[in-house]
Amino acid sequence: MDCGLSFPEEEMLGIDLIIPDVTYLKENIDKVKAFVITHGHEDHIGAIPYVLKEVNVPIYATRLTMGLIESKLKEHNMLREVKRKVVRYGQSVTLGDFRVEFIRTNHSIADAAALAIFSPAGILVHTGDFKVDYTPVNGEPIDLQRFAELGKKGVLALMCDSTNALRPGFTMSERTVGSTFDKIFNDNKNSRIIIATFASNVDRVQQIINAAVAYGRKVCVEGRSMVNIIDVAEDLGYLHIPDGTLIETEAMKNYTPEQIVLITTGSQGESMAALSRMAANLHRKVSIQPGDCVVFSSTPIPGNEKSV
């Protein structure tokens, strides 16, 4: 289940990425049937091209997740070498003695799934990363009914996401962010607006685009991962961008600041992300100017507060 990477700590000089140790998988390759992927965040799919060079087995994932995986495989010239199968919510795949069902959940990336694993010993449920959102932007709330049905059948083990488990309360619906964007755009009608967010948060990007269209602004996109994910999401129908809304960053000079919204990476203060380079006057195309409205549309990941 999943095949992600992590990023190095500051003291890990010369290291760009940290990928899993696949020694066990290589030693037991006859037992490895497939990779089953819950969603398309880097810490869940980022290591796939590297690991598949050692353990080449089929991949099962939902549509957007598979689109992001395929983009990575293309970069590594591996697309033809890897068997892939797109799975719909409610659909199951059989892998040896196991049957794996994909269940719809909500997360900060579209097409996230939980996995119900039917084994000879009993049912195991792996939630993947999730939140309960009754009013998601894409109109597809988490399938709590299916979780309830599995609970009634009896679950041997639950492997559950525990992000923010120690914080009281609940996570607000992604849809509530839309009204915040509306206020920001309304309060900054004479400023260029620069919004940093996670590239993978397609629903967040959609709401930024909706606000830009409503206020008659053109949208520029900066940051390699942001450009890549927007391209994939739009091609697959997960992003709806009216014709003429997106412009190249070089074309900003043809518009006044109040006609522009810039969507960029760098919401976590990453030193090489587009926003950080803009702030340091190191970006080739954009620098932050007096009067710009800069919005961090994300919460700092624990440990990133200082960078932000």
Task: Give names to the regions the model predicted.
Residues Q259-Q268:
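Conserved two-lobed SF2 helicase motor
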Residues K33, L156, I260, D292-V295:
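Conserved acidic residues
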Residues E101, I263-T264, V295:
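Residues in well-ordered beta-strands of folded domains
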Residues M1-V36, H41-Y255, E270-S287, I301-V308:
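His/Asp/Glu-rich metal-coordinating catalytic cores
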